[in-house]
From Swiss-Prot:
The gene is nuoH. One of its GO terms (biological process) is aerobic respiration. NDH-1 is composed of 14 different subunits. Subunits NuoA, H, J, K, L, M, N constitute the membrane sector of the complex. Keywords: Cell inner membrane, Cell membrane, Membrane, NAD, Quinone, Translocase, Transmembrane, Transmembrane helix, Ubiquinone. This is NADH-quinone oxidoreductase subunit H. It catalyses: a quinone + NADH + 5 H(+)(in) = a quinol + NAD(+) + 4 H(+)(out). Signal peptide: none annotated. It holds the Pfam family NADHdh. It comes from Rickettsia felis (strain ATCC VR-1525 / URRWXCal2) (Rickettsia azadi).
Amino acid sequence: MTELFFEYIFPLIIIALKVVAITIPLILCVAYLTYAERRVIGLMQLRRGPNVVGPFGLLQPIADAVKLLFKEPIIPTNSDKILFILAPMITFILSLIGWAVIPFAKGVVLADINVGVLYILAISSLSVYGIIIAGWASNSKYAFLGAIRSSAQMISYEVSMGLVIITVLLTTGTLNLSGIIEAQRTMPWWIDLMLLPMGVVFFISVLAETNRLPFDLPEAESELVAGYNVEYSSMGFALFFLGEYANMILVSAMTTTFFLGGYLPPFNISWLDFIPGFFWFVFKVGFLLFCFLWIRATLPRYRYDQLMRLGWKVFLPLTLFWVVLVSSVLVYTDNLSNV
């Protein structure tokens, strides 16, 4: 019995504890990201932001959660009720399981698999299904149009995201996310410089992937009322809301891993090694999240034709050219990694 426990049950308990240790702080981070967004945008617009519930408004996310929890869930009469309820759950769950392969510090990762990049790409591709199901099951033309927009937008920018990731794989030689970070420790400065434009393209692409300004066309209030979640209330709306912000944190962590060295000190400065890698990871993710909020506060929304033109006529040719350029330079300098 003891042997059975240590061989089968104990590893499952450890995995469950790791999942809880990642999920609960992440949900808290999502809740307080909404608070940070309102405060940052308030300061940029010369107003206070939330400041009533608790000291400095710090309990506002909890008040919002309690309000949504006790609201009545309203299901439209002619909707597909099972899919209508299932859609926000799919979106929220997919936004959490992507974290399984993200390394928070050296050796601190839930599943250190050799195909972590493929796993992340698969999860990001699946996330559109929750939105499409929500738009179709709501039996509303506004929700359906928002879902169609979202699917077209995400497919368009996933192409350029994939090509950008290929340039990273060419320079690092591994699909393991921890391996990508460690490869950046010894990467020549000129390769970092060559990847910089792709880092900018990747960040703009994930803005579109997460439906954030200036690419929030699926939720355009002036055109589609509220987009694919227009018929949702109570916890259904809350799960979509949590999923969107959890995806923001996830894509910031991906950008940090691919282009900013993950848990490594900035510019690989050796005398900063005494600071834990987890601190640097959180600092870099926090900086990128601030960029998300800054962009929302300052940029107007693109028209839909401008959004598509940027994805297919600018980013796709640029990333294709850059893959060829990086490959040629690496072959010429004998730095091509064997993926």
